[in-house]
C-alpha cells in the first residue's frame, strides 16, 4: 500500500495578465472550466488520496460545485488563500488529512497535467523526499543587471524550467515553512522553500505541454493541446 499523498491545488491567484475579471481557473477550455481538467487528473491518479483546493473566498462554492458535478470525490476541502503563495499553501497544508505523508502541490492554472506525470513525480518523491517536474530550457538565458544590461550567460545544460506538481515529504515541507520567516512572500514556488534550508530536490522530466495559463495566447495553446489528445 502506497503512502498517503495529499494534493494541494493552489487556485487563489488573480488574472491580471489575462485581462479578465473572472479567476483564470474558470477560463473555459473547450467549453469546460480549466480547473476541471486539473481536478480530474488528480482524481484519476491512484497515488493521490485526497485533494485540497486553495482558492479565493468568492470562488469556493463554484469549485465545490465543479467537483460534485464531475464526480471528483477526492476533494476533501476548499479553503481560503493567503497573502502570498506560501501562505496559501500553508492554509492548504492545515486542511489536509493527518494521515498525509506527502504533499503534491500543483498550480490550479496548469490544467494540462497528466496522470502519468503526477505518478512520475510522486514516485520520485517517495525515493528522495522532494521532487518536481521540470523541462530542459531551449532558449539561451541571460542574467541582466538593474539597467537591463547583460552580465552573464548561465550554461543551458544546467537550466530547467520548473513546473508543478512539486512533491515533498510532509515533515520536510512543514519544517521549511516554519523556517521561511518574513521571506515567505518572496517565494514564487515551493521548491524555493526547500532550497532556502539547503535541501535537495530531484527534477523529474516534465512535459512542455504542462503549461500555466498566464496570458491570452496560453488559452489558444491549451485548447489546441486538448484537441490533440482527443
Ranges and model annotations:
Residues 2-60:
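N-terminal glycine-rich phosphate-binding loop and ensuing alpha1 helix
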Residues 9, 35, 92, 106-107, ...:
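Residue-level signal for inorganic ion chemistry
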Residues 18, 63-64, 121, 141, ...:
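Hydrophobic packing residues within well-ordered alpha-helices of enzyme cores
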Residues 28, 112, 167, 212-213:
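Short aromatic/basic micro-patch
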Residues 36-99, 180-183:
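Conserved N-terminal catalytic core of the sugar/cofactor nucleotidyltransferase
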Residues 102-104:
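Short aromatic/hydrophobic "clamp" motif used to bind/position activated sugar donors
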Residues 112-204:
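Conserved core of the sugar-phosphate nucleotidyltransferase
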Residues 210-230:
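Hydrophobic helical membrane-anchoring modules
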Amino acid at each position: 500500500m502506497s503512502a498517503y499523498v495529499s494534493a494541494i491545488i493552489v487556485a487563489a491567484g488573480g488574472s491580471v495578465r489575462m485581462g479578465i475579471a473572472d479567476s483564470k481557473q474558470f477560463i473555459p477550455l473547450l467549453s469546460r472550466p480549466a480547473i476541471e481538467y486539473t481536478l480530474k487528473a488528480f482524481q484519476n491518479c491512484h497515488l493521490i488520496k485526497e485533494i485540497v483546493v486553495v482558492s479565493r473566498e468568492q470562488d469556493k462554492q463554484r469549485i465545490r460545485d465543479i467537483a460534485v458535478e464531475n464526480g471528483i470525490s477526492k476533494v476533501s476541502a476548499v479553503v481560503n488563500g493567503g497573502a502570498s503563495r506560501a501562505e496559501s499553501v500553508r492554509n492548504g497544508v492545515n486542511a489536509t488529512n493527518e494521515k498525509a505523508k506527502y504533499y503534491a502541490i500543483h498550480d490550479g492554472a496548469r490544467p494540462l497535467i497528466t496522470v502519468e506525470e503526477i505518478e512520475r513525480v510522486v514516485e520520485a518523491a517517495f525515493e528522495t523526499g522532494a521532487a518536481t517536474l521540470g523541462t530542459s530550457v531551449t532558449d539561451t538565458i541571460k542574467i541582466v543587471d538593474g539597467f537591463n544590461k547583460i552580465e552573464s550567460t548561465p550554461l543551458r545544460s544546467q537550466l530547467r524550467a520548473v513546473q508543478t506538481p512539486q512533491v515533498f515529504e510532509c515533515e520536510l515541507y512543514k519544517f521549511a515553512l516554519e523556517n521561511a520567516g518574513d521571506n515567505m512572500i518572496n517565494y514564487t514556488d515551493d521548491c524555493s522553500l526547500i532550497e532556502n534550508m539547503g535541501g535537495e530536490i530531484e527534477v523529474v522530466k516534465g512535459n512542455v505541454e504542462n503549461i500555466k495559463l498566464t496570458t491570452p495566447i496560453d488559452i489558444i495553446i491549451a485548447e489546441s493541446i486538448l484537441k490533440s489528445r482527443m
